[in-house]
Amino acid sequence: MDPLNESTVNVYLPDSYLKGVISFSETNAIGSCLLKRPYLKNDNTAKVAIENPVIEHVRLKNAVNSKMKISDYKVVEPVNMQHEIMKNVHSCELTLLKQFLTRSKNISTLKLNMICDWLQLKSTSDDTSILSFIDVEFIPSWVSNWFSNWYNLNKLILEFRREEVIRTGSILCRSLGKLVFIVSSYGCIVKSNKSKRVSFFTYNQLLTWKDVMLSRFNANFCIWVSNSLNENQEGLGLRSNLQGMLTNKLYETVDYMLSLCCNEGFSLVKEFEGFIMSEILRITEHAQFSTRFRNTLLNGLTDQLTKLKNKNRLRVHSTVLENNDYPMYEVVLKLLGDTLRCIKLLINKNLENAAELYYIFRIFGHPMVDERDAMDAVKLNNEITKILRLESLTELRGAFILRIIKGFVDNNKRWPKIKNLKVLSKRWTMYFKAKNYPSQLELSEQDFLELAAIQFEQEFSVPEKTNLEMVLNDKAISPPKRLIWSVYPKNYLPETIKNRYLEETFNASDSLKTRRVLEYYLKDNKFDQKELKSYVVRQEYLNDKEHIVSLTGKERELSVGRMFAMQPGKQRQIQILAEKLLADNIVPFFPETLTKYGDLDLQRIMEIKSELSSIKTRRNDSYNNYIARASIVTDLSKFNQAFRYETTAICADVADELHGTQSLFCWLHLIVPMTTMICAYRHAPPETKGEYDIDKIEEQSGLYRYHMGGIEGWCQKLWTMEAISLLDVVSVKTRCQMTSLLNGDNQSIDVSKPVKLSEGLDEVKADYRLAVKMLKEIRDAYRNIGHKLKEGETYISRDLQFISKVIQSEGVMHPTPIKKVLRVGPWINTILDDIKTSAESIGSLCQELEFRGESIIVSLILRNFWLYNLYMHESKQHPLAGKQLFKQLNKTLTSVQRFFEIKRENEVVDLWMNIPMQFGGGDPVVFYRSFYRRTPDFLTEAISHVDILLKISANIKNETKVSFFKALLSIEKNERATLTTLMRDPQAVGSERQAKVTSDINRTAVTSILSLSPNQLFSDSAIHYSRNEEEVGIIAENITPVYPHGLRVLYESLPFHKAEKVVNMISGTKSITNLLQRTSAINGEDIDRAVSMMLENLGLLSRILSVVVDSIEIPIKSNGRLICCQISRTLRETSWNNMEIVGVTSPSITTCMDVIYATSSHLKGIIIEKFSTDRTTRGQRGPKSPWVGSSTQEKKLVPVYNRQILSKQQREQLEAIGKMRWVYKGTPGLRRLLNKICLGSLGISYKCVKPLLPRFMSVNFLHRLSVSSRPMEFPASVPAYRTTNYHFDTSPINQALSERFGNEDINLVFQNAISCGISIMSVVEQLTGRSPKQLVLIPQLEEIDIMPPPVFQGKFNYKLVDKITSDQHIFSPDKIDMLTLGKMLMPTIKGQKTDQFLNKRENYFHGNNLIESLSAALACHWCGILTEQCIENNIFKKDWGDGFISDHAFMDFKIFLCVFKTKLLCSWGSQGKNIKDEDIVDESIDKLLRIDNTFWRMFSKVMFEPKVKKRIMLYDVKFLSLVGYIGFKNWFIEQLRSAELHEIPWIVNAEGDLVEIKSIKIYLQLIEQSLFLRITVLNYTDMAHALTRLIRKKLMCDNALLTPISSPMVNLTQVIDPTTQLDYFPKITFERLKNYDTSSNYAKGKLTRNYMILLPWQHVNRYNFVFSSTGCKVSLKTCIGKLMKDLNPKVLYFIGEGAGNWMARTACEYPDIKFVYRSLKDDLDHHYPLEYQRVIGELSRIIDSGEGLSMETTDATQKTHWDLIHRVSKDALLITLCDAEFKDRDDFFKMVILWRKHVLSCRICTTYGTDLYLFAKYHAKDCNVKLPFFVRSVATFIMQGSKLSGSECYILLTLGHHNSLPCHGEIQNSKMKIAVCNDFYAAKKLDNKSIEANCKSLLSGLRIPINKKELDRQRRLLTLQSNHSSVATVGGSKIIESKWLTNKASTIIDWLEHILNSPKGELNYDFFEALENTYPNMIKLIDNLGNAEIKKLIKVTGYMLVSKK
């Protein structure tokens, strides 16, 4: 924008630089200039265009005057001509169309034959191809007319483009039929001689018309082809069956309607979508769902209709068009009715059709958009008064805050820091302390209001330096306010402004004049990386005078007031910063936002979501409630503009607090109202009246101030998060489950809620009721914060998902393939009309017709139709290259004809069109792509393609086929391909040169531009980049073999790959041309280069075929086919110059697998079978059953550390270094290289970084790096197939492959096998009309060639690494300092349990190696005492060591010493000297000698304790002879000198921050230098605390003692008499089975009586016991009293005991016996004899209670348990009693076997021979089970107190000849017998204390006796909702919600009342059954109470029944 040269300033940018938008103002300007009267609207544009038109319009005017007479023609607007232009069939191109189609069929035949050959589908004898269903002779007119129309208009445009290339700014005049066109790039005219009308429009309008014709042709062509195929064989064509005649009628009706209604008519077209939506709802939903929506919609349409005429008349007032007549309301209404009828007929009740039509509306053209109008609409929206509800806003803020808290807890295991904790209630403070949050169910609105008051402290920070990621945002920006006039053509501005503007630009810096963010930085010579932060911190952006918001037309929907706003670069960077901070720090807490997902992710998410909500999967919940579900899709009107400061700030403030900023996140709301909003569209200048400062210009259309709302696209992320929080609130209020996906205002919400169905409420009604209720709630919620739901675009459905325009119903996604191919045509998506890119676009777009099991044939026909057109027709006259392309193509074809010796020219073309582009053919879609889409290796695939192609070409000789591959292999080496090209894709044969050339062009262009950049950062980096890029190759130049991916990895691990990003970004086609020249024109040199590139590409095949070296050997398989894999490898290795390159080949499934349709499963292959039984599965889509297939990334283990701390760059750098280590593993010198790279980029040594690096696990580097893995696009559409080999590890083929390749990563070969198999199923079904039931893919071993990983030789050249890393500028990642490293390596204790990957060595103190942890902690503890003592002496008044004496007895003294030494060094070595010196170590040890002797006295006192002494003796026997503390001191110091260093546990506080910072720094230095130490952390405040926790964590006690113990524990003095205690136990009833039938066919239960009971009545007589009550069920004296008498044991061993109740009973029965007690130290159960202590009163009779044992040693299934069983008691295990609950039978047997092993090997037990018994609990199984060898069962006891339905029994086992265990049947049988014949005994005495404890734990405050009065009192308590009782204990579990409490409590009270009122009866099952049957609310009782609670309830019930009079 150089102001001195007027011509460059005033570049005419036509509206075509805005994609797809047709500018109203420009059209108006053109017309007004030509007519000298306002054209479309009388506004300022018309005025300036008449007075001072731009020079281009004047030229156009002159041309018109000379070439066309328009004076007597009627002037109309462009849309009025649309109907006539579309119907203007000038010449019929039917013959051309037939030619293209015929050729397309021939070319497709070859491809089809290839498919059939590979799939082994033989054609039948009459040999008619399916392609013959497409009859070229009968192409309907509704296809051919569109082709002719498009062809003619396209010809005109191409002719114009050719002219323009020769002479810029040329004007072309041509007539087409009855129309005459004048075309120029800055305005066009059409004149109709038929209707005597004339119209003016922009070049874009013409292009749009051309595209519309093309789209209509493509749509109709697909419809016709598909229907012809489907008529003859169902399933060949597409799934939709639209009617071409009708689509044609639809186009015509709409065109006619638009031609009458002018531009305003498009507002009707916009409503069609809604109409189709209502049709879709009518198909998928029940009437009540769709009617409402339909009515709203039709009302909307008629509303629009009534407004049309007024709108139009208002606009054309006092213009040329004023007198044109406007149609009557009735006329338009009739046309509208026709259109809708047409749509309805087209849809024909078929969802596929509806989905397809939903998109077809791009086929009617685009409206012209009036920018000023759109802007006025924005202005109006923002002036609306909003009424906001404060409470709603507060709830919204609370929900937002809760999300952040949840996010912190989930990610960082803590809450964010809070300033004002006191605003929280007790309950929330509890969560805060517990570092947790409540579940959704526990929340209420009140909580949100409470949380809203929280204020956070800063958790994240604004980056210090401007980050490259920000600079690389290539966004558009506006000129600053004083230069805003640069936007408009200078002619349009008054003189005064022009002059002042010249002055201003002259003084302005370059960076202010640009319109892109990137250039704003590039051209800034004062750029300072730290500036942005100070700009933010000082908040200058809030008062910046240069701020301006300019709105331009960018969106298609401008008509409804969506504007695209731009602001100057300085402010734009603030916004980029805010967005980036949100995206990095806060968006992760809101997973529902779709802003962060790519397309494939989205597709997967949608598939999962629709699968979940599908009607077919609706279920009832466990309480048999129907789960009502509905889905709501909302669209909010003017979502962005409805946000005001008030609504944004409530959440923005929270974000500000977290980032420590002020108003950074809603700054726009603070500043925009003070700013002028101006319409910055070129042809819409404001009326200035000569005023330069736009703040002083009066408001007018297109310029206003005081903009209140948000601006489209500016705070999207924040607003989306607010919307999510709002839905959180709604969900809590309605107690509904909501799943939502949101993207700004477009929300898809699923709601579900259980309901009870009743008479009038069926499932549909329940769903509907829920949907309406929720919609109302959502609407109200939005209304309260000032938003309005759009009626026409908000709908509810039971099962229809619709988001970002993808329709899914019943869990099935409806692909809309036609939509995707509307745009296919020649020269698409190219700037320089490159033939190769264009062909690739055609290929990939047409493939959309194949994916998801659509039609492969339609895809082939359409693709080849356009490719043939492109190559054989369009290339004859290329706008840039003239005839050169066609000549080159002819040469190539001739060489093909000669080489393959083909007679007919057509066959040559067919063949060439099927040779893949990689070899210079014409086929952009390699064969494999129709079957699987992730390719490991293009080259192999291309070779396989050619192999199959030549196989089916019958007219080519075999020798020729082989010689083709020889020619391929004899391709000459490429001299110019160096490392640079390796950086790109080394896959295709011709690509090296191309890659080299393009990358050269880009690099030179960009680096030269960058190096001239005034911005120091960029210029330095450009020079650095160009200098160093080649040198990277040198680093690894001596390493062989050369390995492209390795080089790539090396390249990326050197930090300047960020520089490459800049280069690539700038060299992207668009921006490079913009940089090279100011306009979007392209210069001659570019054109020449592009043309020569195209010629090179087209000539590749003839170059390949020109040389054939006959001596080359071609590898051939036994069956005569080639081995493609090897050819590919050889080719790749030989086509590079002087490098031994490792071939990264990977087999192609198309050649390495044979497809066999067989049902025998013994075939060694991969089996894929169909899941459904239908003959075909077309149409019913979606896997409803297991779907197999996954897209795998390389597996890597990421070490566990706190990743939050690192920046994104640091994480990327670590990843790159990890990859580097992985690839070059084992290469000499690798460590040094890595060390240099680490120091250069991260600033710390490799050694320290090592624990942070990810570790890759795959064996085969080669493939893992080269397999690019993309998920298949299949899942939701193909019918469900499954594969029997979920993994190939088990498949028989695996054997064969493993034998051949060793244990290599074979799965790689099969990466694609499954998705391929599924596609095959689908394709076979299309081609044959039936679906194979099963197919097997059999690998051919010769073809599978897995490379071993390369063994690298040679050394790295380090010298350059220093140079490259020291040259770093903006690109180097941040350095990591040692302290951060320390923080990162600290997994908190909590994190460990969950992480399954946690390597045992990663964190040394993980609590499982107790001895080591203990020793280390003790050593640290003593060191702590030492350092404390050095600081202050008085600490030793109390003996510190004593508390831990017993712990010292278990330590490992060696570790103790090592840790002591290391810790000492860290505490004392902090004098700042270098740690390396040995002296420092000695110094700190010498210092010990001088330490006060009080310490040594104390220390030695502990160490000389007898048990500790024994332990130390193991380390050094000399210890025995030491006397006195002096001797100890000398000995200890001597030992210390020789000790090694060792890792230390460090202490952190509750926040997770380190406590001893100084020492830690030294420790980190130690790590860096020598040791292989790891950092470990314990989160406690001091070592003594940590120590106790460590040990107690292993012991039991901490959770059992929390339960309130109501027992006589307090007065332990009175010794309780055991025999009297026995009366509290009830008498026991049992049956003893001695000999029993063990056959498994034992009929189940011979008794007919079967009790139907729901409650655990076996607890009825156990009311005297609280914690456990096994003793009420089983008794030693009653069961095996005789045995006890015989053996007379002194000690009984109870293992697997819980709270020790059985032991207590035994203690009462045998007062003299002592006990050994073992219980599994599991957190879930008691591991302390609590009940025993309660009953007996003290523990003196338990001689070994398992104190101090770890978890393994208390687990009876572990050997260590039995080894330590005699650690105290030296008595034999005469009788061992086991009451353990084992997970499964195996564990029971483990225990038995270990018991047997023990008693047969232990020297104490063996003295008793075989007279040892095990009395154990066992759950019988159905089958016959043998006991382990040499263990026999003597008797089985069935207890009355066991669960009735279970199969629990107690067996007495001894040593002897093994026999069988009883089976389920007999146990059941004798259980029933006992149940029928016996009553339960009640205990003789009642223990009131226990009963009271039971009552209280059941219902707090329940007292005994339980009578009517007591229950009434309880009821009264319930109704008084007092605060303090809201937290109470019910059955031992805390319950917070008072509602639940009342629910549970009232349930309990009801039951107790029922018991109170029932009669007294005998305690037997008949009576219990009667009790249950007479109680009406059984189900409620069982649903509301947990297991434990029910047991308590039965105990209390038993007490009530017993105490009845």
Curated annotation (Swiss-Prot):
InterPro entries: L_methyltransferase_rhabdo (IPR039530), L_poly_C (IPR039736), Mononeg_mRNAcap (IPR026890), Mononeg_RNA_pol_cat (IPR014023), Mononega_L_MeTrfase (IPR025786)
Role summary: Responsible for RNA synthesis (replicase and transcriptase), cap addition, and cap methylation. Also performs the polyadenylation of subgenomic mRNAs by a stuttering mechanism at a slipery stop site present at the end of viral genes. The template is composed of the viral RNA tightly encapsidated by the nucleoprotein (N). The viral polymerase binds to the genomic RNA at two different sites in the 3' leader promoter thereby initiating either genome replication or mRNA transcription.
Domain notes: Contains an RNA-dependent RNA polymerase (RdRp) domain, a polyribonucleotidyl transferase (PRNTase or capping) domain and a methyltransferase (MTase) domain.
Pfam hit, one: Methyltrans_Mon_2nd
Alphabetically ordered keywords of this record: ATP-binding, Host cytoplasm, Hydrolase, Magnesium, Metal-binding, Methyltransferase, mRNA capping, mRNA processing, Multifunctional enzyme, Nucleotide-binding, Nucleotidyltransferase, RNA-directed RNA polymerase, S-adenosyl-L-methionine, Transferase, Viral RNA replication, Virion
Effect upon mutating G1696A: Impaired cell-cell spread and/or viral replication. Loss of 2'-O methylation activity but not G-N-7 methylation activity
Gene Ontology molecular function: any one: RNA-directed RNA polymerase activity
SUBUNIT field: Interacts with the phosphoprotein (via C-terminus); the association of P and L forms the polymerase complex.
Active-site residue numbers: H1263 (nucleophile), K1673 (for mrna (nucleoside-2'-o-)-methyltransferase activity), D1779 (for mrna (nucleoside-2'-o-)-methyltransferase activity), K1817 (for mrna (nucleoside-2'-o-)-methyltransferase activity), E1848 (for mrna (nucleoside-2'-o-)-methyltransferase activity)
Cofactor: Mg(2+)
Organism: Human metapneumovirus (strain CAN97-83) (HMPV)
Region (GDP polyribonucleotidyltransferase): 902-1379
Domain RdRp catalytic: 628-811
EC code: 2.7.7.48, 3.6.1.-, 2.7.7.88, 2.1.1.375
GO CC entries: host cell cytoplasm; virion component
Gene name in the database record: L
Cofactor remark: For RNA-directed RNA polymerase activity. Mn(2+) can stimulate de novo initiation but it is inefficient at supporting elongation of de novo initiated RNA.
Annotated residues for binding of Mg(2+): D635, D745
Effect in UniProt of substituting D745A: Complete loss of polymerase activity
Catalytic reaction annotation: RNA(n) + a ribonucleoside 5'-triphosphate = RNA(n+1) + diphosphate; GTP + H2O = GDP + phosphate + H(+); a 5'-end triphospho-adenylyl-adenylyl-cytidylyl-adenosine in mRNA + GDP + H(+) = a 5'-end (5'-triphosphoguanosine)-adenylyl-adenylyl-cytidylyl-adenosine in mRNA + diphosphate; a 5'-end (5'-triphosphoguanosine)-adenylyl-adenylyl-cytidylyl-adenosine in mRNA + 2 S-adenosyl-L-methionine = a 5'-end (N(7)-methyl 5'-triphosphoguanosine)-(2'-O-methyladenylyl)-adenylyl-cytidylyl-adenosine in mRNA + 2 S-adenosyl-L-homocysteine + H(+)
Subcellular location as annotated: Virion; Host cytoplasm
Predominant subcellular localization, coarse grouping: virion
Effect of D1755A: Impaired cell-cell spread and/or viral replication. 50-70% reduction in N-protein expression. Loss of 2'-O methylation activity but not G-N-7 methylation activity
UniProt: substrate binding residues: G1696, E1697, G1698, A1699, G1700
Record-given protein name: RNA-directed RNA polymerase L
Taxonomy, superkingdom: Viruses
Family of the protein in this entry: Belongs to the paramyxovirus L protein family.
